[in-house]
């Protein structure tokens, strides 16, 4: 690297530092005094279910006054308690209302009633990366790199706030109208200084240290980034099997095989991210995220232009106008039932 290039890189890293320091101030204000009860169920017209989970569903809704569309996440308090997800759910809302980044889905309103918790988020009509990846088969390396760069920046932002995301997978990445990523589902996100021990995540994406019940840190997100980049570029994840236990055996073995079409730069990056030895894993070394940002596979990436959303996206989802749900699957519709008695008031008092 020439002197001029080195100087440019140095000044870029300085301005990132300044940006993150300011971002932390903004985050901490909202983290310390979270917004509560900023809307009511009656203000929204419910249109269609976009997805379902073990303790709730996500619906497309329309704000009756403004006509704006949103994605409303509805969580059944009693089911959340039964599945021991109280802490995770409170984390999700507290974190989402405090963060602000171009590739994180925005929480617009949150409220609760006798039966449910509600998180009303920006509606991202392009659907999940998962469905586009399965349809296309695999992404070209430049296509995968465009998405990967956004995740790198997002993790750099989250980690600077002491947040671990813990749930990276194509199902949690939505594609917006400009073809950029919106990370959704902060159900497993957590603010941690140092290490944590909870077993959570998706089998294919779990880092070895989580499987081995060791204390772990934000390096688990960089491992998951390696899994995601592999899956985007190959069309299948690096470790897969019929049963979770078999997947776990492959993950902790430290062996990974690459398709012959992977470039040597991509293989090199992945060996450094899918690195079982934490003292060698990229993102977890003394240079932090810069080992990843300065890697040869990302040589063509203009990080500032990605952040500013100035890079032309490789793929724009089909979009037929506001409220279009054609990029989402169909689900059986169900009435939202609200009890006349308050359920689990104590458990969710801070929501």
From Swiss-Prot:
Autophosphorylated. Phosphorylation is enhanced by vitamin K(2). Phosphorylated on threonine and serine residues. Phosphorylation on Thr-198 is required for full activity. Phosphorylated at Tyr-331 by activated receptor tyrosine kinases EGFR and PDGFR; this increases catalytic efficiency. Isoform 1 is ubiquitous. Isoform 2 is sperm-specific and is enriched in pachytene spermatocytes but is not detected in round spermatids. The modification Deamidated asparagine is found at residue 3. It comes from the Eukaryota. The modification Phosphothreonine is found at residues 49, 196, 198. Changing residue 48 to R: Enhanced basal kinase activity. GO terms for molecular function: ATP binding; cAMP-dependent protein kinase activity; channel activator activity; magnesium ion binding; manganese ion binding; protein domain specific binding; protein kinase A regulatory subunit binding; protein kinase activity. Changing residue 202 to A: No phosphorylation. Phosphorylates a large number of substrates in the cytoplasm and the nucleus. Phosphorylates CDC25B, ABL1, NFKB1, CLDN3, PSMC5/RPT6, PJA2, RYR2, RORA, SOX9 and VASP. Regulates the abundance of compartmentalized pools of its regulatory subunits through phosphorylation of PJA2 which binds and ubiquitinates these subunits, leading to their subsequent proteolysis. RORA is activated by phosphorylation. Required for glucose-mediated adipogenic differentiation increase and osteogenic differentiation inhibition from osteoblasts. Involved in chondrogenesis by mediating phosphorylation of SOX9. Belongs to the protein kinase superfamily. AGC Ser/Thr protein kinase family. cAMP subfamily. This is cAMP-dependent protein kinase catalytic subunit alpha.
């Amino acid at each position: 690297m020439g002197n001029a290039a080195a100087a440019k890189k140095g000044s870029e890293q300085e301005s990132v530092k300044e940006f993150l320091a300011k971002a932390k101030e903004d985050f901490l204000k909202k983290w310390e005094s979270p917004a509560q009860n900023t809307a009511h169920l009656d203000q929204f017209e419910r249109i269609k279910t976009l997805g379902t989970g073990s303790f709730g569903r996500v619906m497309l809704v329309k704000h009756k006054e403004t006509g704006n569309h949103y994605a409303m996440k509805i969580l059944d308090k009693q089911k959340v308690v039964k599945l021991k997800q109280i802490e995770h759910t409170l984390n999700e809302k507290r974190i989402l209302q405090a963060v602000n980044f171009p590739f994180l889905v925005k929480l617009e309103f949150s409220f609760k009633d006798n039966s449910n918790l509600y998180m009303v988020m920006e509606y991202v009509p392009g659907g999940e990366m998962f469905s586009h990846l399965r349809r296309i088969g695999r992404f070209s390396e430049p296509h995968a790199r465009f998405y990967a760069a956004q995740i790198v920046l997002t993790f750099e932002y989250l980690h600077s706030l002491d947040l671990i995301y813990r749930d990276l997978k194509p199902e949690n990445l939505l594609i917006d109208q400009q073809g950029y990523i919106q990370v959704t589902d902060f159900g497993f996100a957590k603010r941690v200084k140092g290490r944590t021990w909870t077993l959570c995540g998706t089998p294919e994406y779990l880092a070895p240290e989580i499987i081995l019940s060791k204390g772990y840190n934000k390096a688990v997100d960089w491992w998951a980034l390696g899994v995601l980049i592999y899956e985007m570029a190959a069309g299948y994840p690096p470790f897969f099997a019929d049963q979770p236990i078999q997947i776990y055996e492959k993950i902790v073995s430290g062996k990974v095989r690459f398709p012959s079409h992977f470039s040597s730069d991509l293989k090199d990056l992945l060996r450094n991210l899918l690195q079982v030895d934490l003292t060698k894993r990229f993102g977890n070394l003394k240079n932090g995220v810069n080992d990843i940002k300065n890697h040869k596979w990302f040589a063509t990436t203009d990080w500032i232009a990605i952040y500013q959303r100035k890079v032309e996206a490789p793929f724009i989802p089909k979009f037929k106008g506001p409220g279009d749900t054609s990029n989402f699957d169909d689900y059986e519709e169900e009435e939202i039932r609200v009890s006349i008695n308050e359920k689990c008031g104590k458990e969710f008092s801070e929501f």
